[in-house]
């Protein structure tokens, strides 16, 4: 046993030392996301005392507008950057995406100027005021960052990207805290910090190497080649972009529904609860996703028979990793939020309880979601995401119709968990894995963990009362 353990450790160390290996790339990316997550969690108690739920709600509305417009403006071509084997086709994809971003900037400037007031009234976000005019610029910078992020992923420059992520987080959080401290928590502090973070990321990625290749983008410019790659990767605007948009919309539905049904304060509570749930997800998932997408694509092209096993191994590891932490936040979320962030945010802790175990399967899905793209089965991803949107809309509408915020969010969390679980099982089925066995094991483990933690909570409550 000791010999086997030693061999396992030595093999792991060897993989970490191997330049360009999956283990080394993951370790580098993980270190960057870990630093960002730790920073985010460390400043959260301060942020909640500088900015109230209403400021967080308006900030969530602004970001929802930016992310939705951004997805449409590039037609979803950026994720295809990994696929071309010839550099000329890759550069043509970059040119296409940048051209779409520039065109969108002009159209947005006109549209947002004409429809500012009706949009703000519909979203009940009049307090954004002049910040609404910043949306086109924020979308443009966001799009360029997406392009450069995909470029770094193609070149496997994970170390440089990890450093950029840390610098961006420090810059954005520092400005947000400073403005909040001086201005008593206006929504402008959150918006200014976020915009500064986007600009910091843009400058850092551009001048960390890509600026030397800008001439290469201009020189081989050809409308014929651009139209050719646009058609070759047409499944991205037809399937990937709608899927990404629906996925984005699925996460933002509470922002729009709760704004109209319960006000921006409720939106702020939801936005803050999900921002903390996203921290561990970003810590693990965002470290895994880019590296694993590159690895899965490479494996399918060279050794397709190995794809099934590497997906299953990663799925199991992520599932086990998230089981207990998200279980704790599910059962003890209201206590944790009240103690750390204050009584004003206790309801946000209740929301995390409704969503906690959905995030277990979201974390595990980082091992399955790339499979649709790798197998070129994006239409199935679109169906799954559309189903997620439908069940979430139904859940929130029921909460609004009954004037019961807690009921709406509880159904939102349960329906999200069910659909995500079914999509994961569908992907494992496509890989010809024993789905029924895997599904039964997952259900038993989740049920046992919840029973144990709820029993512990009842025990603590009993002793506190006594």
Language-model segments: residues:
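Helix-loop junctions and terminal segments of transmembrane helices
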Residues: 71-89, 154, 273, 277-315, ...
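Interhelical loop/hinge segments that connect adjacent transmembrane helices in multipass membrane
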Residues: 3-18, 187-191, 204-251, 294-309, ...
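Interfacial segments at transmembrane-helix termini and the short loops linking adjacent helices
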Residues: 53, 116-135, 305, 309-312, ...
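Signature of the first transmembrane helix
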Residues: 2-11, 18-76, 100-118, 169-173, ...
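Transmembrane helical elements of multi-pass membrane transporters/channels
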Residues: 25-40, 168, 172, 190-213, ...
């Amino acid at each position: 046993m000791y010999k086997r353990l030693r061999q396992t450790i030595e093999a792991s160390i060897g993989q970490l030392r191997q330049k360009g290996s999956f283990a080394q790339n993951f370790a580098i990316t993980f270190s960057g996301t870990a630093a960002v997550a730790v920073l985010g969690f460390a400043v959260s108690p301060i942020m909640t005392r500088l900015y109230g739920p209403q400021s967080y709600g308006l900030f969530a509305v602004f970001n929802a507008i930016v992310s939705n417009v951004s997805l449409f403006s590039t037609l979803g071509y950026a994720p295809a950057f990994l696929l071309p084997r010839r550099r000329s086709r890759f550069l043509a994809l970059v040119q296409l995406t940048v051209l779409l971003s520039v065109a969108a900037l002009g159209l947005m400037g006109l549209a947002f100027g004409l429809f500012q007031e009706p949009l703000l009234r519909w979203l009940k976000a009049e307090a954004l005021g002049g910040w609404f005019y910043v949306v086109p610029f924020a979308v443009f910078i966001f799009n360029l960052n997406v392009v450069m992020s995909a470029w770094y992923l193609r070149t496997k420059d994970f170390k440089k990207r990890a450093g950029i992520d840390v610098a961006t987080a420090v810059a954005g959080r520092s400005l947000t805290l400073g403005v909040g401290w001086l201005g008593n928590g206006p929504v402008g502090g959150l918006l200014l910090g976020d915009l500064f973070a986007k600009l910091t990321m843009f400058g850092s990625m551009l001048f960390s190497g890509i600026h030397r290749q800008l001439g290469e983008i201009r020189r081989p410019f050809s409308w014929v080649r651009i139209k050719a790659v646009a058609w070759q990767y047409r499944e991205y605007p037809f399937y990937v972009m709608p899927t990404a948009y629906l996925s984005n919309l699925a996460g933002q539905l509470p922002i729009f529904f709760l704004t109209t049904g319960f006000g921006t304060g409720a939106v702020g509570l939801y936005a803050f609860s999900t921002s903390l749930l996203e921290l561990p997800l970003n810590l693990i998932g965002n470290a895994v996703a880019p590296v694993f997408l590159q690895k899965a694509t490479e494996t399918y092209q060279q050794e397709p028979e190995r794809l099934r096993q590497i997906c299953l191994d990663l799925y199991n590891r992520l599932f086990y990793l998230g089981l207990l932490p998200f279980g704790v936040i599910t059962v003890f979320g209201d206590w944790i939020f009240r103690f750390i962030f204050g009584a004003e945010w206790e309801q946000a802790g209740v929301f995390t309880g409704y969503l906690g175990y959905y995030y277990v399967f979201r974390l595990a899905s980082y091992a399955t979601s790339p499979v649709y793209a790798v197998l070129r089965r994006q239409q199935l991803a679109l169906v799954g995401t559309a189903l997620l949107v439908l069940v979430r809309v139904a859940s929130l509408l029921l909460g609004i119709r009954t004037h019961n915020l807690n009921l709406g969010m509880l159904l939102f969390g349960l329906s999200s968990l069910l659909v995500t679980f079914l999509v994961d099982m569908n992907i494992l089925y496509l890989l010809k894995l024993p789905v029924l066995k895997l599904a039964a094991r997952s259900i038993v483990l989740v049920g046992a963990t919840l029973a144990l933690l709820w029993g512990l909570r009842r025990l603590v409550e009993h002793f506190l009362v006594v």
